[in-house]
Amino acid sequence: MSLLKELSNPEIWEQFYAYKTSLACPKDVKRQLRGFLDERGYLSVCDEIQAVVKAPLENHFPLPRRSVISKQSSQKKRIVYTYPQAENTVLKLLTYLMLRKYDSLFSDGLYSFRPNRSANGAVRDLMKIQNLHLKYSYKVDVSNYFNSIPVERLLPKLEEVLREDPELFTFLKSLLTEPCVALRESNWAKAPDSSSEDANVKEQAKTITEDKGIMAGTPLASFYANLYLRDMDQWFYDHEIPYARYSDDIIVFGDTEEEVRKYGEKIRTLLLEHGLSVNPKKEELRRPEEGFVFLGFYLNHDVIDVAPASIMKMKKKMRRKARSLMRWKDQNNLPGEKAAKAFIRVFNRKLLESSMDSDLTWSYWYFSTINTTDSLRVIDHYCQECIRYLLTGTHTKARFNAKYEDFKGLGYQSLVHAYYSFTDTSK
């Protein structure tokens, strides 16, 4: 039976709901997904899918929306795609089912989007490598991985994997080979399992044609990203070379600089054979005494901490927000307490509270893995300096008129304190 048949099964949806709500899932997301299940909103999407399977040249799945996300910390822009609300939710279930049914395809060095595996698990497993502190490392990112994967090269791999489920392959092929995307954003409604404003584009939305790879941002992209470089993962596994991949992030280790350079060349060659390239700005070859950075973590001997680049990124966000709130305060002749309270609310939410769609919070991502508070103290100190600036309007010694007790009264929560609370609870 095709996996597509499971998409109309209420029991499968209840299992999916239990899984989603077992994670860091905000109440409004739970409520929206619950309503979607109770109203059987997935049935109409299942009909759309069956229509595509029966006549893929005549029937088409609703188009994904194309969005451009600007990264405030750089001049880069990231292109992401989102299907309409109901369709996106059904594709999430399909992805959930595929990642579990086909997990045995993947070797142990792959950690992304897999059941019972995670970025944190990757870091902990790397720490178990024998004589890791004596090894050289080479880390690299695949350049624009999701949107650069050549669909014509992916399809044969996908067809081979799904040879016993031709209906599923027909449907996925129709999505991957659809040349059009929607541009209009104003008519997209809130998704039933997301607190962001994505989904449900109207029929009159403007469309364009473009090469979009596996469409970063869509649920199924995670399965495709794992599958496409499966043979590279397997090569390193078969040769018993210490290696890990999390989607487009790759790291490999060797006993000598010459050895690890050879592995790096092998990675670049395999990527080129797959129509991909490395991001030269993200290449790092490190000596044993330097430690290494992977997935936002810095590892050196037995120490696991937040990576310096991640600390810098958070400090930049805080500085921008503090300056923005200071302008807002001055323009509206508001008291410093109001601006400081807004700053605290923003970063409490960003660092400590659940985000949309069961994403891990910043703190949970790091707290479950790091074993030192050094970086947290740096971030705490910088955050407190921003709050002092907003309260006093100055960077001079007068800023110390604002006391730590004042911060707490406005709702401030220290990362170091939150970390120790987390570790005590986890014991």
Residue ranges and their predicted role:
Residues N88-K92, A205, Q234, R261, ...:
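Right-hand nucleic-acid polymerase module
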Residues L132-S247, I251-R268, R286:
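Conserved polymerase palm-domain catalytic core
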Residues K76-F106, I208-Y237:
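Conserved pre-motif C helix in the palm subdomain of viral-like polymerases
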Residues M1-A51, T394, F400-K408, A418-K427:
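Non-catalytic, polymerase-adjacent accessory regions of viral genome-replication enzymes
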Residues T95-P150:
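Active-site-proximal segment of RNA-dependent polymerases
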Residues K76-V80, S107-G109, V140, E210-T218, ...:
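Glycine- and acidic
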Residues R268-L276:
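A common structural junction motif
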